[in-house]
Swiss-Prot record:
Keywords: Ribonucleoprotein, Ribosomal protein. GO terms for biological process: translation. This is Large ribosomal subunit protein uL29. It comes from Fusobacterium nucleatum subsp. nucleatum (strain ATCC 25586 / DSM 15643 / BCRC 10681 / CIP 101130 / JCM 8532 / KCTC 2640 / LMG 13131 / VPI 4355). GO terms for molecular function: structural constituent of ribosome. NCBIfam families: L29. Gene3D superfamilies: 1.10.287.310. The gene is rpmC. Pfam families: Ribosomal_L29.
Length: 60
């Protein structure tokens, strides 16, 4: 998701999206610890997505 798309969302939507991404990040880290995760780059993508959302929320 691009920053432009994130800026078009409402603050409430961004908070919900951030919670969903944090849950997904938790699950991916859990899978990584069990050795089940094959695409480790997904963790980095989600962390950056969360950072983008938090940055835009702080701008408001």
């Amino acid at each position: 998701m691009r920053a432009k798309e994130i800026r078009e969302m409402t603050s409430e939507d961004l908070v919900v999206k951030c919670k969903e991404l944090k849950e997904e990040l938790f699950n991916l880290k859990f899978q990584l610890s069990l050795g089940q995760l094959t695409n480790t780059a997904k963790i980095r993508e989600i962390r950056r997505e969360i950072a983008r959302i938090n940055t835009i929320l702080n701008e408001r």
